[in-house]
């Protein structure tokens, strides 16, 4: 089974990746479909989302999760395959990854993203982030940043205010990088 990406992370992913109406987005790790739904809504009717998934049964579950919220999915393409080996898209605005080894996608990303395109990866551990950032720095990616979202709700009444007893803290790290053109020699 897959882990659902929380709304707090989906919102930050959409903002940090600058997902805009009309964007051409490639996603890997279709998962539950929660992030895909956010990407589809953000790209709008004029954009497109291509999602890679290894398992057809998982993609079917994700589509079943998405369909009650979005009947028209004309701008969603699902490709079955290993993103580490197969990435044939070009002129992509944004690449959004929820896979365990995103550093293996970096060489493909440099060929598929447009100059100025954004690479984003969602990872659970800091060791994975470290390995990814080391790989990104060896290429034409710049403005490499990593963040996490901690959501702390508050209990507010007429007579008191305090944080609630439960907090959705660490769920993952979000790393972004922007593809730059190589310097002329």
What do the PLM-derived regions correspond to, one by one?
Residues 52-103:
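S-adenosyl-L-methionine
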Residues 40, 103-117, 135-137:
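A short glycine-rich, Lys/Arg-flanked "PGG" loop and its adjoining helix->strand segment in the class I
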Residues 134-185:
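SAM/dcSAM-binding transferase cores
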Residues 22, 41-48, 115:
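Conserved S-adenosyl-L-methionine
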